[in-house]
Amino acid sequence: VTDHYQNTSKLRPTLKLYRADYRDEQAMTRILEAYDTPAPFQLSPIDPETSRTSSISGVIHFAAYKAVGESIRSPLKYYSNNVGGLINFCSLLGDFGIKNFVFSSSATVYGTVADMGVALREEHCSQNLTVFVDEDGKKQMVQPGCSGLTNPYGRTKWMCEAILNDLAHADPEWTITALRYFNPIGCDESGHLGEDPRDAATNLMPVVLRVISGALPVLNIYGDDYDTPDGTAVRDYIHVTDLARGHLAALKSRADRGFRVYNLGSGRGQSVLELVAAMEEVSQRKIPTQIVGRREGDVGMCVAKATRAEIELAWRTEKSLETCCRDVWRFLERVGNGTLSNA
């Protein structure tokens, strides 16, 4: 482990890191003030704050709680941070003239709509009246709304999207992109950066790694009675590197101001058992599993249709499920088996 972290220290990113809660207005103000730039002229003699500009060209928002089960147990915690925090933070960014914003949304907003058995389009859950042409070439009109939300976490993401949509309508200087993640897995191909949550792992891949490493005895599979080919839940797994490229594409794409939503997924659905089999193939280790009951808030299928991102952001996934598994296995080999948390 020591060698692992000594190696990572040589890979120095050109980043300046600040430790602060984004809900702490004083702390965030101090950070943003460090990037103030002189305005060429004062835009408003009445309100000098409107002349404020910043060397920060854009902000990516990752500051949300994200566990479905925890959101069901502690909804106010999620509404306070995810929704309340976003409102105050965007207000502060506006004061500093920072109005290019990328928001981490989630495929969770589709809720039970995901169980229709078709790849999900952004129009299946829309903030605005939308007209599109479906797969049969027919023009469809979709009213604003999102039915079937199954948990407070998903509702916070939907509420945040609505707030950001309203903000972009009210102030046309804002460029706001909401990225609906499907199921991120994998890690950097170097094996130096990987996922080992300090708290109890809630995502599938970190739990799989803990079982392989011996930190956990067995992998619980939540339900084998879904309407899917093998009965286990089907998800659209996307490599974190592809996800990162999607954020960069969103930051660079400023041709049209306003609010826009994109799915970030591969368009390929794979089951829990298929992921386990892929990880067993890569690691050449057997992963013990047991079937337990479904979890509250889960759906059977959730797969993206990512055509909009392909066309408008020139983005698509490049890495397969097998690549994801190889990369996380490389990380586990670097840190050493048995060193992962057993939370």
List the model feature ranges, each with a label.
Residues E122-V133, G191-L219:
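Mobile, glycine-enriched helix-loop/loop "lid" segments at the mouths of ligand-binding/catalytic clefts
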Residues N151, M159, R180, E195, ...:
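Amphipathic alpha-helical recognition patches that constitute DNA-binding helices
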Residues Y78, V118-R121, L193, I221, ...:
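Short clusters of hydrophobic/aromatic residues that line enzyme substrate/ligand-binding pockets
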Residues G111-V113, G186-E189, V272, D298-G300:
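A short beta-to-alpha transition loop/helix N-cap that caps and shapes the active-site region
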Residues T2-D3, F182-N203, V218-R235:
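Short, flexible, glycine-rich and Lys/Arg-enriched loop motifs at helix boundaries
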Residues G148-T156, P197, A201-L204, D236-V240:
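The catalytic Tyr-centered alpha-helix of NAD(P)H-dependent dehydrogenases
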Residues R23, M205-V207, I212-A343:
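C-terminal substrate-binding subdomain of Rossmann-fold SDR/epimerase-dehydratase oxidoreductases
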